[in-house]
């Protein structure tokens, strides 16, 4: 099986060192909840010098991603087949260039909102691991989750929304890779693209 060769070191064993995981990597990207892995593998193929870390707790998605990795002969992907929070906690400060969250489980009912990935403490960890000028990308097709997530991101020190016009949320980034999930249109709105940048703390 391919999984042992592409498995991320277990974050329970201690801090993760991206430079040791892929020596010489020019960038580090983290995709949280990669689903079937089309986006993860597609970006890895485009950026062979980038360490692509993917987190996905569902084994069907992991199996699909492994097929994409094998078919593409990709050497720059590492997978954590479990909850992403442990990976966030184990990554060093300012060690990641890109955090990507594409179509996470929406938990659309208000009483389930606390089950969503995007919570204040988790977003603070994302901000901590991002390098200055690093990017965070969040995409959902559920309006309530888009509103919820935008509020969580905006209240997080160090994250700045990159929107320049009122309808920027409609526009996919130039490097966006569509997935089967996106094409199914399961949500209640068109895809909402929220892009943020990590800024340095102001000098005291």
Ranges and model annotations:
Residues 27-86:
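SAM cofactor-binding core of SAM-dependent methyltransferases
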Residues 89-98:
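A short acidic, Gly/Pro-enriched loop at the edge of an enzyme's catalytic core
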């Amino acid at each position: 099986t391919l999984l042992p060769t592409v498995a991320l070191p277990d974050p329970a064993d201690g801090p993760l060192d991206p430079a040791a995981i892929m020596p010489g990597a020019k960038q580090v990207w983290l995709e949280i909840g990669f689903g079937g892995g089309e986006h993860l593998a597609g970006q890895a193929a485009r950026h062979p010098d980038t360490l692509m870390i993917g987190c996905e707790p569902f084994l069907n998605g992991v199996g699909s991603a492994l097929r994409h990795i094998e078919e593409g002969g990709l050497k720059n992907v590492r997978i954590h087949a479990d909850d992403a929070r442990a990976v966030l906690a184990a990554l060093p400060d300012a060690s990641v260039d890109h955090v990507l969250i594409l179509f996470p489980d929406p938990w659309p009912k208000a009483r389930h909102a606390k089950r969503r990935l995007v919570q204040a403490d988790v977003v603070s960890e994302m901000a901590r691991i991002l390098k200055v000028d690093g990017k965070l990308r969040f995409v959902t097709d559920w309006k309530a989750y888009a509103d919820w997530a935008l509020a969580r991101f905006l209240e997080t020190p160090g994250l700045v929304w990159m929107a320049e016009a009122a309808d920027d949320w409609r526009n996919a980034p130039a490097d966006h890779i569509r997935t089967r999930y996106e094409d199914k249109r399961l949500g209640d709105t068109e895809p909402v693209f929220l892009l943020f940048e990590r800024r340095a703390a102001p000098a005291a």
